[in-house]
Amino acid sequence: MMRKLFKISEIPQWKILGKEVVDEIIFRTIKPRNRLILELMARGGMRIGEVLKLTPADVDDRKLTLREPKSGRGQEVVFIPQKLADRLKEYIREKEIKSEERIFPTTYTAARVMVKKAGFLAGVHLRPHDLRRHAATFASRSGVPIELVSKTSSAMPIFQRPRGISARSAMLRQ
């Protein structure tokens, strides 16, 4: 009886979304704003908070500058595919967003709900970090050097880090 009470539960493995599933989630999203948010997270490996903080001043063609990222560094740079960069610039132009205004003026909670609904439309339980994890996994499987993937994934690739362990804790263990 006591053994059952204090049984150590097994940590379930994360389910990595396939490229086809992520593409379906993105293409089923109708609103351009929501689609851009999803693509920046899935293709650029950005956190939801980083996407919401973006301003037109941070966008330089394919290079996005993240000011005050969660990692604690002063600035970080994210590179996105050219087609996504073109759509982002077009969105900024169409909406006439000033250089210091946020591109996506929505709350963190509203963005999380949008991501969850996008996953529901595709029949997948989706959380914002699932898209970031997909980006890191896809990059590493595509032959991007592990050091580069690590820099965009909070210092350690997700597939090398035990679940529930932060990047900082994982680095201290090495």
Question: Where do the model's predicted regions map?
Answer:
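Flexible interdomain linker/hinge and immediately adjacent N-terminus
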Residues: 1-23, 73
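N-terminal DNA-binding recognition helix of tyrosine site-specific recombinases/integrases
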Residues: 1-5, 45-49, 114
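DNA/chromatin major-groove-contacting recognition/catalytic segments
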Residues: 5-10, 78-82, 163-174
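Basic, Lys/Arg- and aromatic-enriched nucleic-acid-binding interface segment
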Residues: 15-48
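Short, basic (Lys/Arg/His-rich) helix/loop patches that form interaction surfaces
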Residues: 27, 97-101, 112-151
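Short, charged phosphate-coordinating catalytic segments
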Residues: 41-62, 147-151
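Short, polar N-cap/turn motifs at the start of nucleic acid-interacting alpha helices
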Residues: 59-61, 125, 144-165
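C-terminal catalytic core of Y-nucleophile DNA break-rejoin enzymes
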Residues: 71-90, 98-116
